[in-house]
């Protein structure tokens, strides 16, 4: 069964889902990510970065966020479903990208990365760091320093506002054999 939803304005694919039986897996997660990036690029979604994925029943769902000048823009999200038996794209969901994509001002950084680190838990072992735009609960966006780190055996994402130095959000990263998600 193939289900497709097309936007009235612009005729963009908002949602597509195709169901079929999945055979034995022969495509790796890494190869599926490459296939996904090529698919997105060929359909006009440029500068997309894999952020999270989940494997279920022979299909991997990969979240891709737009990247502008090295800043990960999480509101501009596209989700792809890729079959792990043959690499076929079986689904796409573009609502986040279609509703939010625009050029952002990513130069309004008033707090240095080092200043932002001062607000972190001293027990946090930093694994990676960079800039990201995240959505807020008030339907706006904020430019933040994103720190991926670990305390004991738990991984976290900590977001520090790049303009005010205020902690905006903390997410727990859940690593499972089937993928990486946050909550």
Where are these regions (language model features)?
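Long, terminal "pre-/pro-" and other extracytoplasmic accessory regions
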Residues: 1-183
């Amino acid at each position: 069964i193939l289900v497709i939803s097309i936007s009235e304005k612009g005729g963009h694919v908002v949602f597509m889902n195709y169901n079929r039986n999945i055979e034995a897996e022969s495509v790796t997660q890494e190869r599926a990510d490459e296939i996904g990036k090529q698919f997105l690029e060929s359909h006009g979604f440029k500068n997309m970065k894999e952020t999270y994925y989940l494997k279920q029943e022979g299909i991997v769902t990969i979240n891709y966020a737009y990247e502008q000048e090295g800043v990960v823009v999480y509101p501009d999200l596209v989700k792809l479903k890729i079959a792990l038996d043959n690499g076929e794209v079986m689904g796409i969901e573009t609502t986040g990208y279609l509703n939010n994509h625009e050029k952002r001002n990513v130069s309004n950084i008033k707090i240095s990365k080092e200043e932002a680190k001062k607000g972190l838990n001293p027990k946090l072992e930093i694994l990676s760091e960079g800039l990201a735009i995240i959505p807020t609960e008030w339907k706006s966006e904020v430019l933040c320093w994103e720190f991926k780190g670990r305390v004991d055996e738990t991984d976290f994402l900590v977001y520090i506002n790049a303009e005010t130095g205020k902690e905006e959000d903390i997410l727990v990263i859940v690593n499972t054999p089937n993928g990486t998600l946050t909550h």
